């Protein structure tokens, strides 16, 4: 895949970034170099390689999944202007 100057300008416009002709031309080369590197990475055979999230083997700390009410209902609604039975009262928006 290669990027042309029109694609760079279109992406810049979508991202709301001001890019002049000189910058667009420079970015075209840079983006093509990046995409070339990604294509090289796609050629690497990773068959049998487990995906990893860290270079050091780690395990996530697990906790018991217990359903609770949080025991903080009073604290949560303490600063609300209007409440009823631990619920926020808000003005009706839709008729």
UniProtKB/Swiss-Prot annotation:
Catalytic reaction(s) noted: L-glutamyl-tRNA(Gln) + L-glutamine + ATP + H2O = L-glutaminyl-tRNA(Gln) + L-glutamate + ADP + phosphate + H(+); L-aspartyl-tRNA(Asn) + L-glutamine + ATP + H2O = L-asparaginyl-tRNA(Asn) + L-glutamate + ADP + phosphate + 2 H(+)
Keyword annotations from UniProtKB, A to Z: ATP-binding, Ligase, Nucleotide-binding, Protein biosynthesis
Protein EC: 6.3.5.-
Keyword Disulfide bond: no
Family annotation (Gene3D superfamilies): Glu-tRNAGln amidotransferase C subunit, N-terminal domain
The protein's enzyme class: ligase
An example molecular function term from Gene Ontology annotations: asparaginyl-tRNA synthase (glutamine-hydrolyzing) activity
The keyword Ligase belongs to this UniProt entry's keyword annotation: yes
Function: Allows the formation of correctly charged Asn-tRNA(Asn) or Gln-tRNA(Gln) through the transamidation of misacylated Asp-tRNA(Asn) or Glu-tRNA(Gln) in organisms which lack either or both of asparaginyl-tRNA or glutaminyl-tRNA synthetases. The reaction takes place in the presence of glutamine and ATP through an activated phospho-Asp-tRNA(Asn) or phospho-Glu-tRNA(Gln).
Record's subunit section: Heterotrimer of A, B and C subunits.
Name of the protein: Aspartyl/glutamyl-tRNA(Asn/Gln) amidotransferase subunit C
Organism: Chelativorans sp. (strain BNC1)
């Amino acid at each position: 895949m290669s990027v042309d100057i029109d694609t760079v300008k279109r992406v810049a416009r979508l991202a709301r970034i001001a890019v002049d002709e000189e910058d667009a031309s420079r970015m075209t080369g840079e983006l093509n170099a990046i995409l070339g590197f990604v294509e090289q990475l796609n050629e690497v055979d990773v068959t049998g390689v487990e995906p990893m999230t860290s270079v050091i083997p780690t395990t996530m700390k697990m906790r018991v999944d217990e359903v609770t009410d949080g025991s903080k209902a009073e604290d949560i609604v303490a600063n609300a202007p209007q409440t009823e039975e631990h619920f926020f009262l808000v003005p009706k928006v839709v008729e």
